[in-house]
Amino acid sequence: MSAPTFRLCPADIGLEVAFAGRSNAGKSSAINALTNQRQLARSSKTPGRTQMINFFNVGDADRRLVDLPGYGYAAVPLEMKKEWQVELEEYLVSRSSLAGLVLMSDIRHPLKFFDEQMLRWAKDGELPVHILLTKADKLKYGASKNALLNTRKRLKELGLNCSIQLFSALRKEGLDELAGVMGNWYEYQLDADKIIESSFALLEGDELEDAIEQDALQKDSSQQDSK
């Protein structure tokens, strides 16, 4: 893998809300709109290639917003996709500080296969999920409402109880509803002006390679100790 794994996450304390979605679902745009900052969440020039897990403090160090790597992009090698799936499942099921998941899905193509897999993992971990049907500005009002109703129907078929809303980062529509959901999970009134990027999210170059190497050594050591 070309970036740190979930084993390199900060201490599993406090409360986290994770943002997840396909590589073209508008995840970075949603985070930037929520925080009213253009470049807080950075997109890779090649969708699906960025595997960095970014953490942002929300008010204090015990409340974090987690920007998970995008998934599902066709240009990513199959083996890399498999690695990501293992890492994502481990994080969603075992991360005790994770208070909720915001899942982004393009309103024009809602709930693709891996979106539904993410929802199943969240259900296995008894994790609350709030779905954003992103890019709502791409459809007319009636079509957007139909997409919302159809997605709710699909969730019911899957036996999933998730809250869901329309969202447009471009028009900044749906921000108050999203902030309200996140505030309930954080047990805190969300103030976008206090969301700041944490230093531990900025591993690059040699520092990044060192982190990956240390993670591999720790994993090998753990496997040997278990024998």
Curated annotation (Swiss-Prot):
Coiled coil: none annotated. Keywords: Cell cycle, Cell division, GTP-binding, Magnesium, Metal-binding, Nucleotide-binding, Septation. Mg(2+) binds at residues 28, 50. It holds the Pfam family MMR_HSR1. GO terms for cellular component: cytosol. Residues 13-188 form the EngB-type G domain. Its cofactor is Mg(2+). Gene3D superfamilies: P-loop containing nucleotide triphosphate hydrolases. SUPFAM superfamilies: P-loop containing nucleoside triphosphate hydrolases (SSF52540). GTP binds at residues 21-28, 48-52, 67-70, 134-137, 167-169. One of its GO terms (biological process) is division septum assembly. GO terms for molecular function: GTP binding; metal ion binding. It comes from the Bacteria. Belongs to the TRAFAC class TrmE-Era-EngA-EngB-Septin-like GTPase superfamily. EngB GTPase family. Necessary for normal cell division and for the maintenance of normal septation. This is Probable GTP-binding protein EngB. It comes from Psychrobacter cryohalolentis (strain ATCC BAA-1226 / DSM 17306 / VKM B-2378 / K5). The lineage of its organism: Bacteria, Pseudomonadati, Pseudomonadota, Gammaproteobacteria, Moraxellales.
